[in-house]
Swiss-Prot record:
One Pfam match: zf-CCCH
The keyword DNA-binding is assigned to this record: yes
Organism: Oryza sativa subsp. japonica (Rice)
Source superkingdom: Eukaryota
Compositional bias (Gly residues): 8-19
MF annotations from Gene Ontology: DNA binding; mRNA binding; zinc ion binding
Protein name as it appears in the record: Zinc finger CCCH domain-containing protein 5
Matches recorded under SMART domains: ZnF_C3H1 (SM00356)
Region (Disordered): 1-26
Keywords: DNA-binding, Metal-binding, Nucleus, Repeat, Zinc, Zinc-finger
């Protein structure tokens, strides 16, 4: 290294010797060339073109070399250090001077933002007269350009990755719009002084029918819903109406309305069967007079509209190109609702969904028939004792309870199985007391239906009066 250092210190002569060996160019590119003579830079400057009217080659100012060589169209000054200081050190392309090309179109990006991401490599004109107009920014710091299109990214997300240099319009994001009124305004109603809760006098009682009223004391108000906000009557056919009845003991009780054909009749507490089918109310089903059904075209030669077959309607209306069978256009106003709340249409096609699952997701709006062929009880019965309710296990047949009578001959007889001896006397726990006591003493499988007389190795045991 000492001979090379001496040669470098020799000035121009050393530079010429190193050029012959080929080491001068390599050392000059690495920025190690120096000395008083500066022969390395003089040689490099002589090889690269000097164009005083053009912008300085940024790559040359950074590295001291240019890959384009003599074909580079930019200026390569001999004093590279001084040119780098004038151009801001030559660290970024944005700090370089933008070229002026009078014969070329004006750079739109430069005219809007005052900068150009292509720098000196841009092929458009960048006038120096400061023709860049000041751009107004919105509250978020993004430019407002009324004549341009809205920035789609900003409209969707509220942000823009280009910031103030974006060439699109960024409108002000307005405040949150007021929520539209989903419910009608509540009108003040007169308050009755006899109501236990005067501020809730205009509201309607609402309590699940499965919750007995005896669990809630009269001093606690039940859940109430204003009738103007949530209509309780008839808004959903699957929910039975609720009737508020005040008991004499001070407790508020709730009695369930018609459910599966049950209804309250008369002042008695017994629940009897009502009518078999409930008529369809106008609140749950629009009538033909108030709303006329759209006419769907019948095209026998075309495939059937699957959406129409499933829902009974077609969103395309008369413009639909598929076939709409006319037998599905049954009037809705003349149908009846079954105890399940589903329409009965004897002349229509049975609902396939109801046939498979036992219920219909379309409810009373379904246009198909929902037959009630699976109900085994008689809706014309007049007493709740005739309900098909088994107080004991269903696989055990127990004799029905006989009416009370003073005669001992009318008492029911229970037969014991062969497991008990004929000479064994019945214990008091089995012959006296109600049927529940007998069931506690003997298992249900040991009891069979009563007979008038014993037969075939079986012993008759007389029960007590029930």
């Amino acid at each position: 290294m000492e001979p090379y250092a001496a040669a470098e210190g020799g000035g121009g002569g050393g530079g010429g010797g190193s050029t012959d060996t080929g080491l001068e160019e390599s050392m000059w590119r690495m920025g190690l060339g120096g000395g008083g003579g500066g022969g390395g830079e003089a040689v490099a400057a002589g090889r690269l073109p000097e164009r005083p009217g053009e912008a300085d080659c940024v790559y040359y100012l950074r590295t001291g070399a240019c890959g384009y060589g003599e074909n580079c169209r930019y200026n390569h000054p001999r004093d590279r250090a001084a040119a780098a200081v004038l151009n801001g050190g030559g660290k970024t392309t944005h700090s370089a001077e933008y070229p002026e090309r009078p014969g070329q179109p004006v750079c739109e990006y430069y005219m809007k933002n005052g900068t150009c991401k292509f720098g000196s490599n841009c092929k458009y004109d960048h006038p120096r007269e400061g023709s860049v107009q000041a751009v107004m920014l919105n509250s978020s710091g993004y430019p407002l350009r009324s004549g341009e299109k809205d920035c789609t990214y900003y409209v969707k997300t509220g942000h823009c990755k280009f910031g103030s240099t974006c060439k699109f319009h960024h409108p002000e994001i307005g405040g949150v719009s007021e929520t539209p009124n989903m419910y009608p305004p509540v009108q003040p109603q007169p308050i009755s002084s006899s109501h236990p809760y005067q501020h809730l006098a205009g509201w309607q009682m609402g309590r699940p029918p499965v919750l007995p009223g005896s669990f809630l004391s009269g001093s606690y108000p039940p859940m109430m819903l204003p009738s103007t906000v949530v209509p309780m009557q008839g808004w959903n056919p699957y929910i039975s109406p609720v009737n508020q009845v005040a008991s004499a003991g001070g407790h508020q009780t709730v009695q369930a309305g018609p459910f599966y054909g049950l209804s309250h009749q008369g002042p008695s507490a017994a629940v009897t069967y009502g009518s078999q089918y409930a008529p369809l109310s106008s609140s749950t089903m629009p009538s033909s007079s108030s709303k006329q059904e759209p006419a769907f075209p019948a095209r026998p030669g075309q495939p059937e509209c699957q959406y129409y077959l499933k829902t009974g309607s077609c969103k395309f209306g008369s413009a639909c190109k598929y076939h709409h069978p006319q037998y599905l256009n049954t009037p809705k106003s003349n149908c009846m609702l079954s105890p399940l709340g589903l329409p009965l249409r004897p002349g229509s096609q049975p609902c396939a969904y109801y046939t498979q699952h036992g219920f219909c997701k379309f409810g009373p709006t379904c246009k198909f028939d929902h037959p009630m062929g699976t109900l085994s009880y008689s809706p014309s019965a007049s007493s709740i004792t005739d309900l098909p309710i088994a107080p004991y296990p269903l696989n055990y047949a127990v004799a029905p309870v006989a009416p009370p009578s003073s005669s001992s001959d009318l008492r029911p007889e229970y037969l014991l199985t062969k497991e008990f001896s004929a000479n064994q006397s019945a214990s008091p726990g089995t012959t006296c007391g109600p049927a529940g006591a007998m069931l506690k003493a003997y298992a249900p499988h040991m009891l069979i239906r009563p007979q008038t007389s014993g037969a075939g190795g079986m012993v008759t045991t007389h029960g007590g009066e029930l």
